[in-house]
Each structure stands twice: as C-alpha cells, then as structure tokens.
Swiss-Prot record:
Modification after translation: Contains 4 disulfide bonds.
GO cellular component: extracellular region
Pfam families according to UniProt: Toxin_35
Protein known as: U8-lycotoxin-Ls1h
Record carries keyword Chaperone: no
Organism: Lycosa singoriensis
C-alpha cells in the first residue's frame, strides 16, 4: 500500500515538473508582432519597441512591436 502511494506521488511530481517546463518554453513572438501585453516574449534577436499614439496633441495610447535590435525606424512623409 505504501509503495502504491509513493509511486503515485512520484508520478504526480514528474507530471507537475513537465507542465511547469512547458509553460516556461512558450513560443516567442516573431518580427513585427504586437508585444504590448507581453514585452518579454519577443524572440532573442528582437526587442519590444513601444511608440506613443497621439491625436491632436493628446496621448491616445501606445503600440509595441517586436523589432530588430539596434535598428532605427524613421517616419517617411
């Protein structure tokens, strides 16, 4: 009886560790994907870069995207 309980506890521990590891290995966000709600989820060669949105001089929110590290984007007219 003790062996059955011990085996059950060991199996439960193994399954719990596998689930935790799967949560930690979630897929990263590719380039140009929105990362406003998850700034740390961009792939390793990307950074979550945020920009403020303004309308008539008043701030209306912000947008964040996974972009290449070290690249500067400029607005074209």
């Amino acid at each position: 009886m003790k062996l059955i309980i011990f085996t059950g506890l060991v199996l439960f521990a193994i399954v719990s560790l596998i689930e935790v590891q799967a949560d930690n290995e979630r897929a990263c966000l590719p380039q140009y994907q929105v990362c406003t709600d998850a700034p740390g989820n961009c792939c390793s060669n990307l950074v979550c870069d945020c920009y403020g949105r303004y309308k008539s001089g008043a701030r209306r929110g912000r947008n964040c995207f996974c972009l290449q590290k070290g690249v500067i984007y400029k607005r074209e007219n």
